[in-house]
Amino acid sequence: AAEKLFISQPSLSANVKRVEHHIGYPIFDRSTKPLSLTECGVQYIKAVEKIKSIQNEFEGFANDWGDLKKGTLTLGGSNLFSSWILPPLIADFARRYPLIQISLVEETTANLARMLRHGQLDLMLDSSVLDATIYSCRKFQEEHLILAVPGAFPINNTLRSYQLPVEDILSKKFLEESCPPVPLTRFKSEPFIMLKPENDTGKRARMICQNNLFEPNIILEMDQQMTSYNITCSGMGISFIGDIMLSKVPLTSDVVYYKLPACESSRDIRFYWKNGRYQTRAMEEFLKM
């Protein structure tokens, strides 16, 4: 046996005695020739074989997991991100790593942050600034808020030189210095459709109005940016809409668009994960996309 294991007989005997001392019972019956296993020895060998099998199975899983042949990835986003931004990223990731099981959760920012903190999500995509003591983040892209005004509002007739052609929004030409922001105070008497104050867009929109020395006439408060835009399209009121969303949805001639002051309307869209959370290979590869 020692020769088959490529070790000396004394070394093999010492190892056997060490195991017997550890378990408290003899493995071999030394009164027989050749040596035979005791009842305890038989069970010990079976247990060792099971342990070795489990170890080999896990090593196989770890090798597959490292190559992204197994694993899960749970993503979260608000209505805007889960509807328009995350699906093409998920589709691309699934093409590259078809054996990874992907889940997408659509919720409010507050609920997504709670789920992320409790380990129910791997990553969330959002425009809000979350607590850096709890969450880590990576910038995905920059977004710019635009003023969306129902085309039937008479105020548009006095602001034609500030109106943004759709192609300038899609090409981001409106970000050039040659394109001036609209004087926002001209809209102080108009009705606004705002997102709720706890939403980053709602919070930022109110700040923009306050910085322009007026309180907006809010007739409706919504939870989702897409909903507020649809209400603007119906002609009810003015909304603040991100250029990312406008690049994804069908634009309509029933709405007129205006540039807002850059320093107030620009923000980062970020992927967030919980501080101290072990980053799986699936998370790492998704963040590289």
Predicted stretch roles:
Residues 85, 243-245, 254-289:
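A late-sequence structural motif
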Residues 108, 112, 117-120, 127, ...:
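Hydrophobic hinge/microswitch elements
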